[in-house]
Structures are given as C-alpha cells and as structure tokens.
Design a protein with these regions (language model features):
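N-terminal targeting or regulatory segments adjacent to alpha/beta-hydrolase or S9 domains
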Residues: 1-119
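Short, surface-exposed "cap/lid" segments of acyl-processing enzymes
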Residues: 135, 141-182
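Alpha/beta-hydrolase active-site loop
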Residues: 195-215
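Gly/Ala-rich beta-loop-alpha elbow adjacent to hydrolase catalytic centers
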Residues: 224-228, 232
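Hydrolase active-site cap/lid region
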Residues: 234-289
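Short alpha-helix in the alpha/beta-hydrolase fold that links the catalytic acid
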Residues: 318-327
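Catalytic histidine-centered segment of alpha/beta-hydrolase-like enzymes
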Residues: 341-352
Length: 379
C-alpha cells in the first residue's frame, strides 16, 4: 500500500514538473521579443494588369481591402471579383511593380508598407521620443490643430498599422504621432528583454503624450489597436496625464489577457486550466500583473469619450470583452460592432464606413470646447 502511495506521489510530482515546464515554454513564446510574429506567405496563382489570383485560405477569403508585399515592393488589392474552392481573385488598386504568376508574397492586413511619404504622399518628420529606456523612433505628420492624435500599434505589429487611417486624420488637420515602443525594431529593449504585455509599455504611451504636450499640443487623442488598446487603457488608469486626453479610439482592443490567452490555448487543444499555468509562468518571468491589465469593466472614474471597433470573427481577441466594455459605459462608448470581421480588420472590411465613423466621432469630441473629463492633472 505504501508503495502505491509513493508511486502516486511521484506521478503527481512528474505531472507538476511537466506542467510547469510547459507553462514556462508557453510564457516564453508569449513574452519573447521577435520582429516577426505571424507571416502568411503566398505564391500568386495568376495575374493580369487589373486582377491578381491568390490561393484560397482563411486570410485571403475575407472581402475588403488588403495588401501584399515582396522584397521592397507592395500592391494594394481590392474586393474579391471571383473565387472558387482553390483560389480567390481580387482587383488590383495599386502596385509598385507588375505582378506575375509564381511571385512569392506576404499577405499584409495593414495594406501599406513603408513610411507616410512613400506610401501615402504625406510629409512627415522622423522624430525621437525621450523615454525612460532611451529615444523611441516615431513618425510625426504635421497638422494645424492643437489636438494631436497618438497612434499605438498592436502586439508584434509595425508602425505601418496606423497608415490605413492616417489620410483621414491628416485631412482633418490633426498632427499625428505614430509611436514605436520598447522592444520594437529600432527602439530600446526592456531591461529583461521580454514583452510585458502593456504592464510597462504604457509608459511609452505616456512619453508620447508628454512629447506632444511639449511640442504644441493642448490635448491628445489616443488611438490603439489590439495590445495598443490595452496600453491606452492602462495609461488611463495609471498616468498623471489623463486630464489631457480628449478622446480615445480603440480597434479590436485586448482588454482581458486571460481570455485572449485562453482563446489561443483552446485553438492548440490545451485544457482551460493550462491558461493559468502560462499566466503564472509569465508573471514569474516578467512580473506581469494580469489582474491589473483586465480592462473589460472600465473603472468608475473613467470618463473619456471612446469610439470602439471590434469584429465578430476576431480569432485573436474575443469580442465578448469589447461587448462587456461597451455595455458598462454606453453613454461614453460609441460601439461599431463589425459582423464577420477578423482581428483589427474593421477598416479593411469597409474603409468608407470606418473612416466616416472616425470623422463623426472626432468632429463631435474635438471641437473647441475644453477637456472636462478626468480628475488627474499632469505633474
């Protein structure tokens, strides 16, 4: 009998050991710095002067505006004009070089590749934002207004994520600061060389706000995609500059890391409890406070007008978090719930509707009335 007990104890210890190792590896994949997270590579099936045919897969089957890139060139593709079980044919809106069958390309949900001048013909300055870790590279597109817009890209996404909405913001006269943050390419590394999932990165958003205020901004609109949305919401809870935030725009914001990680664990056929193991390992490795990064239910003192986009087909960040978030403050949050749209692709699905929503919201919230929300002031 005693032998059986010892065997059971040994089996439990072995199970705990392997579970801990698995959680440590999972946390490492989540926190490890990499310039490329997920790249979809395609070989073109065919092309004409007006259309391009691609292999049919989940990414290429979504209707809307998308991009492809190869070497130093790119093309912007329009809506689907034909499809079958094997291929999808799209209209070519723009291409920097002729396309041909067999060309190896990467799929680009951000549509544009390059800086604002090269891709959109918008003049900009390369600036460096002082931060606690060193200078952060940023693009500054000038404008005549005293309200600046600060764009915060998502997890493993490039600054180009914000280029889709940049022409709209520039047309409205806003100075736009496209920020990079710690561990981005060209930006300083965090001391432990790990991502902190917004728990420390929000301070780089604060550095961007401080820079804007020091260079003529009277107030700021924060605009975040995915983890950038988590960083914006963390800023609103922790920063001493919240009184200077005029409004917020969130696109597929990551408001609850537990649910986002659990979604990916489910896809990989791991049990629900393994999500907690990964979080435990991530907290141990990087000191992340996951409870403090849960923004699904806004703090009572949160009084910032917000425009929220989220797609019902989001496979990365569950839309339920945005549903709960919007329901908590219906008087402050204007919710654009996009049917059948994947992660951070609301603009791609319907650019005109997306841009109209942004224009309407910013026109309403950035008139010449003073900022009246928020109880904190800058120090």
């Amino acid at each position: 009998m005693l032998t059986i007990v010892y065997v059971l104890i040994l089996l439990v210890l072995i199970l705990m050991l392997f579970t801990g190792i698995g959680g440590w590896i999972g946390a490492g994949r989540l926190l490890r710095i990499t310039d490329v997270w997920y790249v979809v590579t395609l070989r073109l099936s065919g092309a004409t002067e007006e259309t391009v045919t691609l292999p049919r897969q989940v990414e290429t089957a979504y209707d809307g505006i998308f991009g492809i890139a190869w070497q130093h060139d790119y093309a912007i593709l329009g809506k689907i004009v034909a499809s079958d079980t094997q291929t999808v044919t799209r209209r070519i809106i723009k291409t920097t070089q002729p396309l041909s069958a067999g060309l190896l390309v990467t799929w680009n949900i951000f549509v544009y590749q390059g800086d604002p001048q090269r891709t959109l013909g918008l003049a900009y300055d390369d600036v460096r934002i002082p931060s606690e870790l060193g200078p952060l590279p940023a693009w500054l597109v000038p404008g005549e207004r005293t309200t600046w817009v600060l764009l915060v890209h998502g997890f493993h996404a490039p600054r180009e994520e914000g280029l889709r909405i940049l022409p709209t913001l520039a047309q409205m006269g806003f100075p736009v600061l496209q920020l990079s943050y710690r561990n981005d390419a060209g930006a300083p590394r965090s001391p432990d060389h790990l991502y902190h999932l917004g728990d420390t990165e929000w301070r780089d958003v604060e550095s961007g706000v401080r820079y804007a205020l020091a260079h003529g901004a009277q107030d700021v609109v924060l605009y975040g995609w995915s983890m950038g949305g988590c960083m914006v919401e963390t800023f609103l809870r922790r920063s001493s500059y919240t009184a200077q935030i005029r409004a917020v725009i969130l696109d597929a914001p990551l408001l609850d890391w537990h649910k986002a990680i659990d979604t990916q664990m489910h896809k990989l056929h791991f049990p629900h409890w393994f999500t907690y193991v990964v979080e435990w390992a991530a907290a141990l490795r990087a000191g992340i406070n996951f409870a403090a990064l849960n923004h699904e239910r806004p703090a009572r003192e949160r009084t910032t007008p917000t425009l929220l986009f989220h797609g019902t087909a989001d496979g990365m960040v569950p839309i339920g978090s945005s549903d709960t978030f919007a329901q908590a403050q219906p008087d402050l949050i204007t919710y654009q719930r996009m049917n059948g749209v994947d992660h951070a692709q609301a603009w791609n699905a319907d650019p005109q509707a997306y841009e109209d929503a942004v224009k309407t919201f910013l026109t309403r919230e950035t008139s010449d009335k003073p900022v009246s929300h928020g109880e904190k002031s800058s120090t």
